[in-house]
Amino acid sequence: MRSGSPKRVAPAPAARSLALATLLAPCAFGPLAAQAVERPATRDTAARDSATGEPHDLPRDTYADPGVADLIRRARAERYARARGLQSFEVTFRERIYAGLSGRVVRRERAVFHQERAARIHWDSDGDRIVRWLGVRRGVPIAGIGTEFDEEPRTDDVFDLDFEFLDPAEDRIFLGNEWALHPLADSAGYHYRYRSGDTLRIRFAGADRTVTLVEAVVEPREARFDRIVGSLWFDLDDALLVRAAYRPAIEYDFAREEPEDADEVPGFVKPIRARVEYITLDYGFQELRWWLPNRMAFDGTATIANYASMPVRFEWTFEDYSIDQPQTLDPGEDALPEGWTRWVEQDVEVEDAEGEGGSGDVPQPAEDDSLPSRDTRVIHIVPPVDSLLAAPELPEPLFAGSVDAFDDEELDQLRARLGKIDVPRPELPGPQLLAGPLPGLLRYNRVEGISTGARFEWPTGEATSFEVTGRIGVPEWEPGAELRFVRETATGRLGVGVYRRLTDLGDWGRPLGVGNSVNTLLTGYDDGLYFRETGIELFAGHGGARSSWELTLFGERQQTAPKTTNVSLPDSWGERILPPNVSAERGEIAGVSGRLRMFSGVDPGDPIVSGTLWGEAAAGDFDYGRLALSTALTVPFPAQWTLALEAGSGTVFGHPPLQRLYHLGGPYTLRAFEPGAAAGQAFWLARAELGKGFRVASNDGYGIGGSTFRVVAFGDAAWAGDRDAFGTEGWRASLGAGFSVMDGLLRFDIAHAVRGGDAWFLHIYADGLM
C-alpha cells in the first residue's frame, strides 16, 4: 500500500516498451499490460517444515538434487541481504528503448518509437533516493516527431522512474506491468522445478579472491505466460542472485489469455501474439563486496494478423559507482540553479509475503504488520529541458548500430540455454470457426469478384494448428479450399498444406490483400495478375533482426483464371473497365521457390539500403528456373529532403509457362501502366524519387530524421522481353507526383506514361520507397 504525496504509478520498463510498440496497433499489447496474475486458493500457513521453512505438501520433484535444494532455500532466505552493510551509492543510469514495425507486408522495418534517458542516481538505505536527470530524448522516427516536454516537468511521464528496479535490496522478476511468479517466492515450489546447472569460478588476482557462481535451472510446472523458464546464477558463498536469463514459459496469445476481450477486437487484426525472446540482467561485484545492478536487456516481438510484426527492445546500464559517499546530487530547493526544477515524491510501501508488492502468486499470505515497510522520499532534479535533448551523457539510440549492453555472443548463448529448458504442454483452446471480414477471408478482384471464405482452426499445440479454409467468389462461382497443418510463432512459421486456390504471379506487391481489394473497387485498378493452382506444399519462413526469408517446396497443377467482373466505382461512371487477366498455360510442375529480404537499418536520418532476392526452379510439363534481384537506396538530405533510388533485374532459364515470365506494370515496377504491359523472360527496372518532408510538430533539438508526410516527384523506367534481346529497345517510362505518409507506409501517386504509352493512373498502395 502507498501513502503520502500523490504519485503516478510508473509502468515497468517492459510494459512501457510493449505499450509503445502498439502506436500503430493499440490492441496488440493492451491485454498483456492489463492481465493479472492468478492467485490460487490459500494454503494452511502453519503446515511448514521446521527445518526448511517450506510447506510439508511441496511436490517431491521440486528439487532435482540436494545441492539445488540447499541453494534455493538459502537464496530465498537471503533475498533482501544484498544491501547488508551498504549505506549508500551513486551510479549513472542509462536507458534505451526501441519499437519497430516490420513483417511480410513491408520491404523493410520502420522505427516507430525510441527513447534514451540518462540520470545520476543516489540510493540511501535509510534516507532519500535522488534522481538528477542528465539527458532525455524520445520520438517517433517514422513520423519525424521528437520530444515535447510538458510545461511542468513533474507531470511529464518521461521522468517516471520505478526505483524498485534500482534498489539493491530487490531482485525483481518482471513481465509486462505485472510481476511473474518469482522462482524464489515461498510458494514457488508448487509452480516450478529446480535442478543444478553449471559452475563458474572467477578469480580476482589483485585481491587474491575467488568467487564461485552456481547455476539453478528453473522449469515451470505449468505452460503459462506468467510462469518463466530461467537460468539463475548465484554467488555460492552468499546465495545472492548475480545473473538471470529468463523468458515466459510460452508465447502470449491474446485469444488464449483474454478470451472475453478477444471477442471484442476486430477480426482483421487477429491473431495477436507476442514472444519474449529473453529478459536478462546481471550484477557487478562492487568493491568485491556488494553485488549491485550492472546491465539489463529485453527483447520481444508482437505479431498482428500474421502479417505485421513489432520488435521491441530495451536495455539498462549502470556505471561509475560511488559507494558510501555523501550525496552530491541535490543542492536543496534554495540553492537550485535558475531554470532547474525540483520535486519530491513520498512513498510508503508494504510488501506482501512474496516480496512482490501485492501482484504475486500468494497461496500463503502473511499479515501486513509482519511485513517490512519503507517510508522514503524520491527527489527528482531536472535541469532546463532544452539542455536534455543533446546531453553528452545520452546513449545512442538502439537502432543506430551502437554497441549494445550485451554482445551477440552472450545473447546467443543465453538463447540456447533457455531453449534447452523443458516446458510442459499448454492447455489448448477449443476449435473455432472464423468467417467474415478477416485477413485472407474477404477480398475483391477482377477474377473472383467478391470472394468470401470461412476457416476452421483446431489448435494442436502451443503454436501449432490444423486449418481448413473454404471460399467462393461471386460471380465466378469457382470454389477454393486449403487444408494446412502449421506451426506459427512470432518469429517464424513451418507447415504443410494441400490447396486449390487463386494465386497471383507473386513477384511484386500483395494483390490478394485488403489494400488491392479496396484499390480495385475505388479506382478500377487491379494490381494483380492471377492463375489457379491445385497441389501440395511444404513451407517455412523466419524473420530476423535485419533479414527474413521464405521457402516453399511444391507440386501443383496450374491453369488459367479468366476475368469475370468489371465492377468498380469508375466503371459505374463508365470511365474505366478492368483489363483482362493473363492467360495462364495449363500444366503440372514440382519445384522450389524462395525469397530473401534484407535491409541495413531503420534510422531515417541515415542512408538505408534494402533488397530482395527471389527465385524459383521447377520441372514437369515446364522445366525452368527464375532468379531476380531488386535493391533500393534511401538517402536523407538537409531540410527534410530525401532521395530514393531502386534498381532491379531478373531472368528466366529454360522453358517457362506464360505465367512464370516477368510481368511489369503497376505501383511497384512501372507506374501509369497496367500489370503485364511489359512481359518477357528478362527484365530491368530503374526508379527514382525525390521527396520533401513535412512534420506535424516542431522538432527543435531533435536530431533524428523522419517526416510525417512527404510530397514526392518520381520517375520510372523499365523493360521486359526476350533474354537474348536484353537491352533498351522498347523500354517504357513514366513520370508523376505523389503523397507519402509515415515513411512510405501509405502512398498516393498520380503517374503519366511518357514513353510506350500516354495514360494517366492513380495509384493507392502500401509500402512505397519513401
PLM-predicted stretches and their roles:
Residues 1-15:
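N-terminal secretory signal peptides that target proteins for export/translocation
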Residues 70-77, 351-473, 479-481, 498-500, ...:
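Outer-membrane beta-barrel initiation region
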Residues 75, 230, 236, 278-287:
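Extended lipid/amphipathic-ligand handling interfaces
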Residues 94-96, 123, 298-299, 457, ...:
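Outer-membrane beta-barrel pore domains and translocons
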Residues 35-229, 250-258, 275, 300-436, ...:
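Structured extracytoplasmic
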Residues 594, 737-745, 758-770:
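Outer-membrane beta-barrel "beta-signal"
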Residues 146-172, 416-424, 440-442, 494-541, ...:
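C-terminal outer-membrane beta-barrel translocator/porin domains of Gram-negative envelope proteins
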Residues 17-30:
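Bacterial N-terminal signal peptides
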